[in-house]
A protein has these predicted regions:
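NAD(P)+-binding Rossmann beta1-loop-alpha1 motif at the extreme N-terminus of oxidoreductases
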Residues: 1-76, 91-104
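Short glycine-/small-residue-rich Rossmann-like dinucleotide-binding loops
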Residues: 79-81
Length: 104
């Protein structure tokens, strides 16, 4: 079921802070990182310290991450430029539809 307003890929410092900012402004947000342990750590930190943690949902599977976002999907990429960005887009594409948006 698609319940999240927006998705964010990349949970380094900028990704974490942007995800929290979006959640703090009342939007539901799905988060994904290619290293599942990074997502797990971020979600555990949020549950313990962030009032808006209920608007954040972490995913270890990129397909489930995409499915959780309302159509047309809006996905923000905050990953290293170059090969990492290309690999992330390649992993997302099989799960996206024509009207979905990737913001890089």
């Amino acid at each position: 079921m698609s319940t999240n307003d927006i998705g964010l890929v990349g949970l380094a410092v900028m990704g974490q802070n942007l995800a929290l900012n979006i959640a703090d402004h009342g939007y539901t947000i799905a988060v994904y990182n290619r290293s599942p342990e990074k997502t797990t750590e971020f979600m555990a930190h949020c549950a313990a310290h962030e009032p808006a943690h209920e608007r954040l949902t972490g995913f270890a599977d990129i397909g489930e991450f995409v499915k959780s976002i309302k159509r047309p999907r809006k996905i923000i990429l905050l990953v290293k430029a170059g090969a990492a960005t290309d690999a992330t887009i390649a992993a997302l594409l099989p799960h996206l539809e024509a009207d979905d948006i990737i913001i890089d």
